[in-house]
Each structure stands twice: as C-alpha cells, then as structure tokens.
Amino acid sequence: MMRKLLLALLAMAAMQMSGAIKIVAMSDIHAMSEMLVEKSGAAIDKYAASDMRMIKESAEILRTVIGKIIEQRPDIVMISGDLTKDGERLSHEFVASQLERLRAKGIKVLVIPGNHDISNANAKYFNDKERRTAATITRKEFRDIYSHFGYGGDVKCDTASLSYAAEPVKGLVVIGIDSNRDEENLLKARGDSVNTYHTAGRIKDATLQWITNQARSARAQGKRVVAMMHHHLIEHFDKEAQLLDKYVVADHENVRNELIDAGVHAILTGHLHLSDIARDYNNGDSITEVATGSLITCPFHYRTITIDADRMSVTTHQLKSIASNPHLLADGKRQVEQAVPGLLNSVLSRLMGKIEKLNKKLSGVMALFGGGESLDLAAQKDKIAATFHRELDDLATKAFIMLYEGNEGQNPQSKVLIEQMNAGIKAVLASSLPASLGDMVEGFITENAMPMFDTQIRSMLEDRNHCGTPQEVVVDDHTASFKF
C-alpha cells in the first residue's frame, strides 16, 4: 500500500512538472511515393481499384494532414506502423521527408514499423500496363531512415527487435513495441527461392521482458507510460483473436497481463484500419487500447490525444477532402463498399466450417430417431454460397462501413441492421440443412446456432467487448477520457 502511494505521489509530481501534453496519433498511413508510378495506366489503376485504401491519393493525403498537424502544434506525433504501401525504399524516403516538416517546427515524431514496412516483396513500380520489383528495406535501414523519429539520440533500444523506449517530453515515456515478423519474410530479390510475407504479429519473449522492465523503471521514477504497437493487443469485438487472428498479437492475453502488471495502462495501435477504443482488465486493473484507422481509408481518421495529470482524452478528426479531390470522403466510402463482397468469401469459408459442424450435430440427433437425410455439403456448396451473397452482401457492406466509422452502437441503424443480419444468417443456415425436416429446421437453428451468431453480431455492431458477460464494456470510439 505504501509503495503504491509513493508511486502515485511521484507520478503526480512529474505530471505537474510537465503539464498537459498534446499528441497526434495516426496509423496505417500506407504512403506510396509518386515516383513509383513511372507511367499511369492499367497496372496502377487495377491495383488501386482492388483495394479499400486510396492508394493513388496517399501521398497527397499525407502532405495535407502534415499541414493540418503543423497548424495544431502538438508536442508529439505518434504513428503506429504501416508507414508505406509495401515497404518501398522510395516510399519510406518520402514519409521521412514529410516527417521532417514536423521536426522543423519543433514537433517530436515517433514511429514504429508495421507488417508492410520491411522486407516486403510486394514493393513494386507501376509503368503503364506493367509492374516490376522495387527496392524494399531491411530492419537496419528502417532504423537509419527514421533515426530522428524514434531510433536515434538517447532513445533506449531493444537488441532483439525494433522496440524502443523514448522520453519525448519530460515525464512521459513512450514504449514503441515491434510486433512484426518481417525477419521471417523471404524475397527472391535477395536470393530466396520464394517470396513470403507475414501479416500476423508476435512479441518475442526477450522483447516482452525488455518492455516490462522499461515500463517498471519509468513508473518507479514517477513517469507516465504510453505504449504503441501495430497489432491489436485487445480484442475489439468478441472472438477477434479467432476470427481475425492475424490482427491480434499472438498470446495477447498474456501480453496484456504483463503490460498491465508493469504499469502500462494505455496503448495506441492500428493494423485493422478500424477506429475503435477498447478496454480490458486483469486483477482489477485495466489497459485501454486506442486503435486508429488507416489515414488513407474511409473514414480517414486521425486522433488528438491530450494527457493531463492522470487522464488521457481522445478526440477524433476526419479528413474530408484534399486539393485534387473535394469529394474524397464520398469516393473513399465507395472504395470500401466495392471491396467488401470479395472479403466476404473468406467469411463464407469460415461459415462453411460452422455449417458442417451444425449438420453433423443434426445428423447425430436424427440418428437417435432412426436416421434421416444428411446434407451433402460439397454438392450444395454453390447453393449455400449463392444464398450467402444474396442475403448478406449488402448488409455486410453497411456493417463494414459502420465498423470503420466507429461508435456502432450509437448509430440509429445499428439495431435494425443486427436484426437483418440475424435473419440473413438464419436463411443461409436453413439453406444448408436437410429440407425434409421442414419447420423443424428453424427451431433447430434458433436453439443451436443463432445465440452464438447474435452475440457476435451485437458485439460488433453495438461496440460491446465481452458482450453479455459481467466484464462487458463499451467505450466511446471517437471522444473518450479515461485514467491511465
């Protein structure tokens, strides 16, 4: 008890010395150097059309937002990874040149790499109808390029990763956590037999130990600690770590507990291109994760964070236009909408696994009553897929936009959309079960499948973490204030 009181008094003293600190947080800026488009044509057009990101506008978006940040005059700018489209050297050099504009105005900048940024075989030039390999960078080169933005001076660096601990403002320690697996990437351009690339994240054991040591040391000196990582630490909706395992850091519950125990109560992340704020607990203590969407993907969010005493306050900003496109927001929304149906194919693949389990369960029940018809899923796959897309494509597109915008539960369309999606899923499940059961199908689905789907959908579209449990929590995604 006395130790906690002493730490609290020291922290208060440090906070009073530093005063309020203003931070701008961005993530997944995915900038592409304009030099990579040697000649506009089918190659870049096809690539850009297949993506939710506004790739062709990315450089102008970054320039525009940097200008707005200079007007705001924050103390620090923090960017939680995926600085480039695909790790192109030219794109990194462009990003660094834009960050120099901030440094020239006395604004501290801290970055960490994302999964796209290092040793990426997808680095390309675009020339009319052709694409060809562009130079990517190594981990050492990343450190060199961003030596003024977290990787130089008196910053403490982890020897096992690109993690670091910096004190950009007296009394505030920022721990940049490298959660990437780019060391495992293979590139033909470097003599490997194949190109491989890793989206998923993990923190090495030695790195986690180093991080917690840095946090404990800072706390013992009465300093505030904020962490920054590319991958999610907390599930922002139920079962995120199962459904989107590449977007939540491996062993996330253990990492969460270790960070909380070390005194880390706030972390900035990105990766999923979703602006969402979530909170989780361990032994009555908490950590709040502020995930910020991609700067070049609708709704084009970035954040202002104010740290005052022991409180962190978050405000969300939206870029609506750029000089070359006054309709950026509307065009960006259409870009997301056109990409959703393709993404749903991976959802359908997972759903087919659920349907197979449901069908086996039903077959077991039927066997107790003398057997009966069992659905040949392979033969019915096309029918199920057609029903899935007919029932859910439009609804899922609306849901996707709602998720990206944040504060889903406050959206007046949320309740209606939940009901419609439940009805659509029920129709898909019904199409997958033996027709000979007639009215029994609906009752079986309602009892055995829909509670799980309903909880999942409500967690996502009502913005509820640990939905329906005593640990359920809802945090405002756009404007939040909390102790840390």
Each language-model region and where it sits:
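His/acidic metal-ligating clusters that form di-metal
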Residues: 69, 73-76, 108, 173-175, ...
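Active-site-proximal beta-strand elements of phosphoester/diester hydrolases
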Residues: 21-33, 171-185, 228, 286-293, ...
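N-terminal active-site segment of His-dependent metallophosphoesterases
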Residues: 19-89
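Active-site environment of divalent metal-dependent phosphoester hydrolases
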Residues: 32-35, 85-87, 115-123, 182-185, ...
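Hydrophobic h-region of N-terminal signal peptides that target proteins for export
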Residues: 9-17
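Extended active-site neighborhood of metal-dependent phosphoesterases/phosphodiesterases
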Residues: 94-216, 283-284, 304, 312-313
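Non-catalytic terminal accessory segments
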Residues: 3, 324-484
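Divalent metal-coordination and catalytic microenvironments
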Residues: 28, 77, 82, 95, ...
